Amino acid sequence: MADGFCVKKATFKEIKLIPIDGIPLVKPGDDLPGIIIRTANASKIEWIEGDILVIAQKIISKAEGRLVNLKEINPSKRALELGSLTQKDPRLVELILQESTKVIRHRKGVLVVQNHHGVILANAGIDRSNLEQDKEQDWVLLLPKDSDLSAKKIHQELFSKTGIHLGVIINDSIGRAWRNGTLGTAIGVAGIPSIIDLRGRKDLFGNPLRVSEEAIADELASAASLLQGQADEALPVVLIRGFQKQTPSIPASGLIRPKETDLFQ
């Protein structure tokens, strides 16, 4: 028992995904760890050492005040040019450029960039969905300024409130270069490894693995996104239980392929 919270030892041989239902609409400045704990307690969810919380990027960004009113944006010459080429709002393009270090590809309706943390994605992850609009505002939502840092702060705050080490993954839906559709992807990680090096381990026939690295944070982020959904599901936080990996914490930045080994840029 830690500060009134129940602590159990995980003994599972299966992985469970438990949505934390009832998370309210998040506003700038909200205490997100506190909201998560109160909502989980209301649902009588007991925390277990080793639990992992997958949190949708959108509520992180809202709590951090990453909302921008497009009506206040003045597009640059470059944004006007790219806006014409892609047929995108040049004000949105201006924000995309501000959030990026490099334009990777563009064509009509598509603008793929590399953001300041090395993630390659469309529109720098800037989104309009599930944002309340009115005649005076034209809101868009940016990604957290530093998703790994956001995850670390939430991880630390959850520990201070519960006395339990909870892994934290911030996930977002990102498209893939070689396949159709978006996939839940880890953009911020704390308290667990984002990637596990399996090289040197033996396969079923005793052969050593030579190149295998498992992007476990992406796998967990994708699994949670099945419950979180993309529309009006209103389930932005999912608890993953039973995944036990006793290895050092590695942030989501560990998933970014170094430039010298990237064959496609």
Where are these regions (language model features)?
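N-terminal and secondary-structure boundary signal
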Residues: 2-265
